[in-house]
Amino acid sequence: MTKITVVGAGSWGTALAMVLADNGHDVRIWGNRSELMDEINTKHENSRYLPGITLPSTIVAYSSLEEALVDVNVVLLVVPTKAYREVLQDMKKYVAGPTTWIHASKGIEPGTSKRISEVIEEEIPEDLIKDVVVLSGPSHAEEVGLRQATTVTSAAKRMEAAEEVQDLFMNSYFRVYTNPDIVGVELGGALKNIIALAAGITDGLGLGDNAKAALMTRGLTEIARLGRKMGGNPLTFAGLTGMGDLIVTCTSVHSRNWRAGNMLGKGHSLEEVLESMGMVVEGVRTTKAAHELAEKMEVEMPITAALYDVLFNGNNVKDAVGSLMGRVRKHEVEAIPDLL
C-alpha cells in the first residue's frame, strides 16, 4: 500500500483518487474548498465536480495542504495549468524528501509556454524529486467514475518510474501503458484541446461530418508537426495520447473544450462561454500558448492560428472556416516530411 496525495479535487482529480483507492492505496485528496472536502469525508461524494458517484470511504480529504502531505512520497497533481507554480511553491514547504511527482493536467503554462513537467522541475528542488511522471490519455472523468473501461499512458524519462506509476493505477477497468516520450505525451494531451474547441465550433455551425473529419485529421497533423519540432516522437501522436485523446475530446459531450467550442459556433461570445462553463477550459489558454510557440519555432499551424484569431482578435467563426478552406493548394503530407 502506497501513501498518495492527490492535489486538486476537480472531476479528474476525484476520479483518479477513486482509482487509487480501489487499488487499496492510502489516498488523500486536497482542495481549497473546505465545504467540498467536508462533503467528501462525510458523504463520500464530490457533488460539484463528479456528481452521482459514490467515492470509496477510504479517501480522506483535506483543505490544509500541509496536513495532506504528511509522510507522503507520491503526489498526483491535477490542477489548472495557470495554478501550478503557486501550488508547487506551497507544496515544497511541506514535502519531506525525494518524491514521485505525477501530473495529469493537459495544458501548457500561460505566459511561458512551458510543459507542466518543466514547471515542476523548475519549482521543486532536485533533492525533493525522485521522478516526474505524466499520466495522460483518452479519459473522461465521468466514465472513470462509473468504472467504465479506460486506457491511458504513463510517461517518464526513466522507464522504471513510468512502470511504477503504471502499477499504482492498473486494475480491471483502468489500463495503463508506458512510454518514454514525456514530451510527446504532454504535448498530445495539451494540443488536442485546441482541436476539440475547433471541433465544437464545427458542430455548432452545423458543418457536418465531412468537415469535422477533415478538421480532426488536419488537426492531428498540426499537433504532430509542433510536437516533432519540440522533440516528441512522431509515433506518440498516433497513440493514446495523440489520436486517442483527440478522438474522445472532439466527439463527446463530456468534453468541456468541445462544449465551449459548440457554444462559440452557435454565436455566443467567449466571455459568455467561460462564464457558463463554470470549469476551466484549458483549450483557450493552450491556443494562445501554442500560437506563440508556432510563431517562435516557425511551425505552420493554420487551424490553431484561425482559432486564435476567433478567441483573441474577435474574428467571426464563419470567416475563420472560409479562410481555412481558401488556403493555397497543398499536397497532404508536404508539410511533415520529417515525420514519415
From Swiss-Prot:
Protein name listed in UniProt: Glycerol-3-phosphate dehydrogenase [NAD(P)+]
InterPro entries according to UniProt: 6-PGluconate_DH-like_C_sf, 6PGD_dom2, G3P_DH_NAD-dep, G3P_DH_NAD-dep_C, G3P_DH_NAD-dep_N, NAD(P)-bd_dom_sf
Domain of life: Bacteria
Catalytic activity: sn-glycerol 3-phosphate + NAD(+) = dihydroxyacetone phosphate + NADH + H(+); sn-glycerol 3-phosphate + NADP(+) = dihydroxyacetone phosphate + NADPH + H(+)
Gene Ontology CC entries for this record: cytosol
Originating species: Bacillus thuringiensis (strain Al Hakam)
Encoding gene per record: gpsA
Subcellular localization: Cytoplasm
Pathway(s) served: Membrane lipid metabolism; glycerophospholipid metabolism
